[in-house]
Regions:
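Short, Lys/Arg-enriched N-terminal segments with co-localized hydrophobic residues
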Residues: 1-2, 7-23
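Glycoside hydrolase catalytic-domain context in secreted enzymes
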Residues: 18-192
């Protein structure tokens, strides 16, 4: 039997997609009803920088995620947000600005598959990528991490990357979706 609480990670390939989605939605609502306020809050903050909090009494495992727009960045030992601990050896692909310049969606999907394989090997459930911010300023210090100033190209390449990673049963998280172009005061800007 399957140990998945919420259904198959490959649910999108099932012919009964809408029925499965309904069952999953019902199961999620029931699961959330059983959680305490502290448990719900704990899922929002995580166990540490790279792991969600598990809830053993409900069978909810801790989930590991790691950075990965162009390669798995998983640290050995205790994780820290500064990346001061030694990283696990992994493939490092060219940055997104270079891979997107290939205009090769099949190559990007293959890259995603390889990243998915590495996630499986390192017990990572979610890869934090791709980075899809649309380049608006040449002064953005993270432009190397973004695919293009063209939303069509970014969408096509990001979709291929996601398909590849998810084909291995690994979740993805598009990041820096919008408005991540500012360098001056980037860590303390007010939204007022």
């Amino acid at each position: 039997g399957s140990s998945h609480l919420l259904g198959s990670p490959q649910i999108g390939t099932d012919k009964n997609l809408f029925k499965e989605d309904f069952i999953m939605s019902r199961n999620l609502k029931e699961l959330i009803r059983q959680m305490t306020l502290e448990e719900k809050a704990g899922l929002c903050s995580g166990a540490d920088f790279w792991n969600t909090m598990g809830i053993e009494r409900l069978g909810i495992p801790s989930v590991m995620m790691t950075d990965g727009p162009h390669g798995l960045r998983k640290q050995e030992g205790a994780a820290d947000h500064l990346g001061l601990n030694k990283s696990v050896n992994a493939v490092c692909f060219p940055a997104a600005c270079a891979t997107a310049s290939s205009f090769d969606v099949e190559l990007m999907e293959r890259m995603g598959q390889i990243l998915g394989d590495e996630c499986q090997a390192e017990n990572v459930s979610m890869l934090l990528g791709p980075a899809v911010n649309i380049k608006r300023s040449p002064l953005c210090g993270r432009n190397f991490e973004y695919m293009s100033e063209d939303p069509y190209l970014t969408g096509k390449m990001a979709s291929a990357y996601i398909r590849g990673v998810q084909s291995k049963g690994i979740g993805t998280s598009m990041k820096h979706f919008a408005a991540n172009n500012q360098e001056t005061d980037r860590m303390q800007i007010s939204s007022e």
